[in-house]
């Protein structure tokens, strides 16, 4: 959504927004490398046409991650970016501009590793293992510019600007996980069904205020 409007001869406003929603299912990254070391014997599929997890005694298929309900990595995210400005010219040669930009980002990542899964899991994880990670972040920047530009005696250009900028960022995350689920179909939705739990959380914040002053002069 975009808007630019001249509301008075001395005032102009604008607004821009962008919203993105994503639902992403990610695959594993080590299937090909595991297939290079797999013994090229045995039956890759069962008589029912399903992937044969143990295709030779003691040898497990590099395709086991693709067995139904054995590996899940789903991320849902929402991103919002909004910016606006107001530009004022109260007197000739003097301009005041104020801009605000902000972003809001949320994501939920759900992962599940079944007993037959080959994909790397966290070092603390048992088998099966499931986790849900939530990330929230937001930031905004507010800038103000007071500018004066004039021409004296047709040949002398004189200008000056006073600039301020305020920025703040904040992010937080939480992760809950458990191991030992008995039903693969539960995926990452029933963490309380595991026999051992693991929890992590984090928070970070930064903020900054900046000032600048500039003078310009040019002849002809």
What are these regions, as identified by a protein language model?
Residues 2-81, 97-210:
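Surface-exposed loop/interface segments of Gram-negative outer-membrane beta-barrel transport/assembly proteins
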Residues 213-220:
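Short, intrinsically disordered, charge-balanced linker/junction segments flanking boundaries
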Residues 93:
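Active-site and adjacent substrate-binding regions of carbohydrate-active enzymes
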